[in-house]
UniProtKB/Swiss-Prot annotation:
Pfam families: Tubulin, Tubulin_C
Binding positions for Mg(2+) per the UniProt entry: E69
Entry comment describing in which tissues the protein is expressed: Expressed in roots and leaf sheaths.
SUPFAM superfamilies: Tubulin C-terminal domain-like, Tubulin nucleotide-binding domain-like
Protein name in UniProt: Tubulin beta-4 chain
GO BP annotations, alphabetical order: microtubule cytoskeleton organization; mitotic cell cycle
The keyword Nucleotide-binding appears for this protein: yes
Induction line: Down-regulated by abscisic acid (ABA).
Protein role: Tubulin is the major constituent of microtubules, a cylinder consisting of laterally associated linear protofilaments composed of alpha- and beta-tubulin heterodimers. Microtubules grow by the addition of GTP-tubulin dimers to the microtubule end, where a stabilizing cap forms. Below the cap, tubulin dimers are in GDP-bound state, owing to GTPase activity of alpha-tubulin.
Region (Disordered): 423-447
Principal location: cytoplasm
Amino acid sequence: MREILHIQGGQCGNQIGAKFWEVVCDEHGIDPTGRYTGNSDLQLERVNVYYNEASCGRFVPRAVLMDLEPGTMDSVRTGPYGQIFRPDNFVFGQSGAGNNWAKGHYTEGAELIDSVLDVVRKEAENCDCLQGFQVCHSLGGGTGSGMGTLLISKIREEYPDRMMLTFSVFPSPKVSDTVVEPYNATLSVHQLVENADECMVLDNEALYDICFRTLKLTTPSFGDLNHLISATMSGVTCCLRFPGQLNSDLRKLAVNLIPFPRLHFFMVGFAPLTSRGSQQYRALTVPELTQQMWDAKNMMCAADPRHGRYLTASAMFRGKMSTKEVDEQMINVQNKNSSYFVEWIPNNVKSSVCDIPPRGLSMASTFIGNSTSIQEMFRRVSEQFTAMFRRKAFLHWYTGEGMDEMEFTEAESNMNDLVSEYQQYQDATADEEGEYEDEEQQEADDM
């Protein structure tokens, strides 16, 4: 019931995905061979959100793994939980996308996409009532961005009424892996605006900062970063998998978070984040979780919520706690920081409570915010895009795969439109509406 089909693509997506399955397996008491070794009926009650039960009693993730080169897939397969995935669900090419969006979207990726869709269909047919898809990918490379967005648009055609949730790793402001990141990211956002329902925006630099500043790790690895991401991913769907007093699902989340269809890019946060040594010295309380969760330093993308305003936000608490206290804390946050919330959406923070905390914690919370300050991410990528595109730098790699310059121009203006939409709602006030009506009335009279 209410299954979610997980898809991971490209190197980044596969590495995040692998970590995510470690976390979810741990929560449901499933060992690396797919056997249940847990100690609570609650772990099994709705295990089928993310798992198929095979005939021999093994639990198999509803996961599709794709890449245009075999390398990362091999390391997932040999990793700690590599044996749990269905072998047919690994779909990979040999050529690689070479960090080129066009290769992922139009040439190499297009050749592989049908075999990926076959696996997706097979998994979807195994579902009793498919709720939606969650896609892990990065926007800076070739496969996750190009082929990832191709797959999203194909799934959109075939399953138009199912939720499409993405965990998208944006290029970082200061750390760059590839020169052509701005191109790949802009072309991807162009697709995500149209075809995804909810995008959780992540970026490595913000994750590094959390590891340095809050977790006090001196040399964070991608594994540490991905662990942060997977804690958030597990938090987003915990209400579907464990009983709670205030449930939420992907669709409820969307209804509460998206005031305008194009503005579906969210910043995420997680609490408690404490360094490994100091965990046992703190008692967790709802106020403390709330305070940390709303802290700008805890956001997993390089945009500062204090530079914009929240259109909406959602908080998911996990653990044994009083819902009354949760509600009070949420109202408290809105009252104390009212200037950071748009006043034309009253009560714009939704909260949900799930009774089962993550492993090793007594309580935890996941934060998802729809803030206008996310435009900083798009603005930054857009500036880098324009700088290169003006000189047509690196463009031949894309046109050589059959792309047209026109597509770049469209993607660029779509991204800039998105930025101005966020800006427009950041500046909007509740009483402006009245002024417009007066003007219209005036015009009508003049006519």
